[in-house]
Amino acid sequence: MSKPPPKPVKPGQVKVFRALYTFEPRTPDELYFEEGDIIYITDMSDTNWWKGTSKGRTGLIPSNYVAEQAESIDNPLHEAAKRGNLSWLRECLDNRVGVNGLDKAGSTALYWACHGGHKDIVDMLFTQPNIELNQQNKLGDTALHAAAWKGYADIVQLLLAKGARTDLRNNEKKLALDMATNAACASLLKKKQGTDAVRTLSNAEDYLDDEDSD
């Protein structure tokens, strides 16, 4: 009886490594890669042979080679976002690296893209249907806090248009508006908060009207 096929890997379960040496395959099933190549491990169900992808090619890699001859990259999406490296970010997403993963600071890749002012990275992350806009890191800051603090009005505008919340406070009880370092960011945030306040008031009035009509 043949064993069932391995379950497809879930986003976020992909392990990512950088090859320290070139690997020469001995069989057609094995994956060739060179020193410095990024390897995405998608199936570790076999203890001896792992399935991996590099430069669009997929094949088998001896697990002991990866363990001994490759450098683990813990948060590749975050690194790509910090550096503004769009091609690497796209490759990570294509290889199902989780878009909402958190680094040691509790930050997402979106946070670092906003912190660095990398609008093209933010645009690419926004193509992911399950992107989390309002994740707060260990300091309580969101991507909107980061963009406002660094003064990137174009990114603040993108986040607000996507539906980022303006009412979240960080550990110092500060809103994104309180963190804004220039007039353009502050103006966008004030306008959005004003719109939200009017909408909330309108909803409350509708609720009271409904109660009165009962």
From Swiss-Prot:
Domain SH3, residue spans: 12-71
InterPro entries xrefs: Ankyrin_rpt, Ankyrin_rpt-contain_sf, SH3-like_dom_sf, SH3_domain
Residues that bear Phosphothreonine: 200
Cellular location(s): Cytoplasm
Claim: Cytoplasm is one of the keywords in the record: yes
ANK repeat locations: 72-101, 105-135, 139-168
Annotated Gene3D superfamilies: Ankyrin repeat-containing domain (1.25.40.20), SH3 Domains (2.30.30.40)
One GO biological process term: signal transduction
Pfam family, one: Ank
GO CC, any one term: cytoplasm
Keyword terms: Acetylation, ANK repeat, Cytoplasm, Phosphoprotein, Repeat, SH3 domain
Modification N-acetylserine, positions: 2
Keyword Acetylation: yes
Residues recorded with modification Phosphoserine: 202, 213
CDD domains: SH3_OSTF1
PANTHER family attached to this UniProt entry: OSTEOCLAST-STIMULATING FACTOR 1
Domain topic, free-text comment: The SH3 domain mediates interaction with SMN1.
Function: Induces bone resorption, acting probably through a signaling cascade which results in the secretion of factor(s) enhancing osteoclast formation and activity.
Quaternary structure and partners: Interacts with SRC and SMN1. Interacts with FASLG.
Name of the featured protein: Osteoclast-stimulating factor 1
Gene that this sequence comes from: OSTF1
